[in-house]
Amino acid sequence: MNRAFSRKKDKTWMHMPEALSKHYVPYNAKFLGSTEVEQPKGTEVVRDAVRKLKFARHIKKSEGQKIPKVELQISIYGVKILEPKTKEVQHNCQLHRISFCADDKTDKRIFTFICKDSESNKHLCFVFDSEKCAEEITLTIGQAFDLAYRKFLESGGKDVETRKQIAGMQKRIQDLETENMELKNKVQDLENRLRTTQVSSTPAGGVTVTSPSTDIFDMIPFSPISHPSPTSAGNGTQLPPIPSRSSEIKRDLFGAEPFDPFNCGAGDFPPDIQSKLDEMQEGFKMGLTLEGTVFCLDPLDSRC
């Protein structure tokens, strides 16, 4: 490679969007290999990687080894590298992890892209011999990235927001179920006390309380609203306090805050899901440099 990868003045997509969003576009190529690079972008970075891998292949070829053939399957979900006959997936490069893609104008067969490895988080440069269709493959990867980015912004953000609301409502429901169980236990305790209370009736129909220090249930009156000092009745029983109007508005009849689905807080994502969303957002935000042209659309929506 005697000079830099040339820069395209514009982008002309090669395929119908449905071919990449609902299916994939296959290409056959020879896989020269992959090597670690220090930077996620740069013509000089990929030029050095191509030289290194070409030299390594020349040595292996002199030893009688053939360059392995692979099948590339490009879609909005990534670039898969498969063994042509068995269809075994050798590498699966997600688009938001691909930061640079280029084809060599001095050699129509060679194209390369840089992808961040999902396990090591190192930047790897993949190099292919594509039988004179390097430019088409480069454009196809660029188109797939463009479509995937749009899909992430248009539908991904809404889906994320919906899942947040559902998670918040599920958490609120769990809290309400816990409160409800506690209230049921309190009611059961009241019923048990009622059964053991000794109540005597007079001929006039009045009720005589066996203990002047308790109410008709032989216990201190229960109030789910508040616990101010009780008021004494004429017969010495302790009467429950009357709740204020403001408390009645803020609490339901069980003393719990009324459930409002519009005001419930958004729940947190599990760490693995949240980290995946953050990773995708960061990858798409970086954009894909395609032969020096950055395919980075509008700024990321704050909802994502």
From Swiss-Prot:
BP terms from Gene Ontology: apoptotic process; lipid transport; phagocytosis, engulfment
GO cellular component annotations of the record: cytoplasm
Subcellular localization(s) per the UniProt record: Cytoplasm
Domain PID: 21-176
Domain of life, source organism: Eukaryota
Modified sites of kind Phosphoserine: S223
Pfam families, A to Z: PID
Alphabetical UniProt keywords: Apoptosis, Coiled coil, Cytoplasm, Lipid transport, Phagocytosis, Phosphoprotein, Transport
Tissues in which the protein is found: Detected throughout adult and fetal brain. Detected in cerebellum, cortex and hippocampus (at protein level).
Coiled coil: 159-202
Function: May function as an adapter protein. Required for efficient phagocytosis of apoptotic cells. Modulates cellular glycosphingolipid and cholesterol transport. May play a role in the internalization and endosomal trafficking of various LRP1 ligands, such as PSAP. Increases cellular levels of GTP-bound ARF6.
Self-association and partners: Homodimer. Interacts with GDP-bound ARF6, but not with GTP-bound ARF6. Part of a complex composed of GULP1, ACAP1 and ARF6. Interacts with ACAP1, LRP1, MEGF10 and STAB2. Interacts with clathrin.
Similarity annotation: Belongs to the ced-6 family.
Protein name, per record: PTB domain-containing engulfment adapter protein 1
Organism: Rattus norvegicus (Rat)
Lineage: Eukaryota, Metazoa, Chordata, Craniata, Vertebrata
